[in-house]
């Protein structure tokens, strides 16, 4: 399905059962920050890295493939993959599951570390400034996050 915005296909979801693996226990409306939550450091992100890693390496490939299917495309039709920049092992795993060579995968985690929800927009901005994106390129943005949540979107680049 082609939308006017350049969106070719999208997949997203959430599984609250994994919420305990990546969360901020306090600081929101459900559990407002207090002296106690600050002292307990509950206003910071808590993560079970091993569980999040296992989730990330399986979901990034699945969600990307589902978004590609909705776009009636195959991975080899992609010009570039922009994965969430959590760590290099997760990035290479996502590329491997899509059978994408690393020269088609934008990586900047080595420069900035994990910039959380900003990682894909930063990567897109970098790629555009570097001239790595051309009008008509088929790209995919592929990520995961707290909750546990995931999403992938296939786009036709229009700039």
Predicted feature residues:
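Condensing-enzyme catalytic core mediating Claisen C-C bond formation in acyl metabolism
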Residues: 1-54, 58, 62, 144, ...
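Short, surface-exposed connector motifs at secondary-structure boundaries
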Residues: 72-77
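Claisen-condensing/thiolase-fold acyl-transfer catalytic domains that form or cleave C-C bonds
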Residues: 57, 61-62, 68, 79-159
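Short helix-to-loop capping/linker segments positioned immediately adjacent to catalytic or ligand/cofactor-binding
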Residues: 52, 67-71
